[in-house]
Regions:
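Short alpha-helical
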Residues: 12, 38, 105
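Rossmann-fold dinucleotide-binding core
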Residues: 30-100, 108
């Protein structure tokens, strides 16, 4: 059995959920989080099965961007890590193993600084969101600029992710909070 939790990036809400879920699940159940930033070690003890708890983060628009990141924590049994990689491959995802716990995993570790750069350009008065997005899309051929990405993931999710990072530019986090 496999349970995939896909809640907002809210640490306390996830802890509360796992505390309620753990007593009603059969011990054989593997539990994974679809978190894109939070570390599985933060929640493992609340699941009642730390050896069967890890992360399986699906990229946005998985029907098109069929990629997932698989990350264990120190108590995860390697057998379940390997089984989760196989499961992801079986459902036609490109399973990318993350070998060490890292906030942001692979994708968001690269994406968040890029998003913050776009916000910084706007907050600093360098340009407007439309021009910033056009600079990125026309300059790189990418389908979306940073502000379109914010529209895709939602401002609340973006804010929660950004707040997980230690070096948030001082002007950016208040802007995101205001936009929510």
């Amino acid at each position: 059995d496999l349970i995939i939790e896909s809640m907002a990036e809210d640490t306390q809400a996830k802890i509360d959920f796992y505390k309620k879920l753990a007593p009603v699940l059969p011990q054989k159940t593997v539990v994974v989080t679809n978190s894109s930033t939070l570390l599985p070690s933060t929640f493992a003890k609340y699941t009642g099965r730390p050896e069967k708890y890890l992360s399986l983060h699906f990229a946005n628009s998985i029907w098109k961007n069929n990629m997932t990141e698989v990350m264990a924590q120190s108590q995860t049994d390697k057998r379940y890590f390997d089984e989760l990689v196989d499961f992801a491959n079986d459902i036609r995802m490109l399973a990318l193993p993350v070998n060490k716990e890292k906030n942001g995993y692979l994708l968001n570790s690269m994406l968040v600084p890029w998003l913050l750069s776009g916000l910084d350009l706007y907050v600093s008065g360098v340009s407007d969101p439309k021009s910033i997005d056009l600079a990125w899309t026309r300059g790189t051929g990418a389908p979306k600029g940073p502000f379109r990405v914010f529209d895709t993931v939602g401002i609340q999710t973006a804010y929660n992710i950004v707040m997980q990072y230690q070096k948030v530019p001082s002007l950016v986090s208040p802007l995101l909070k205001k936009m929510m």
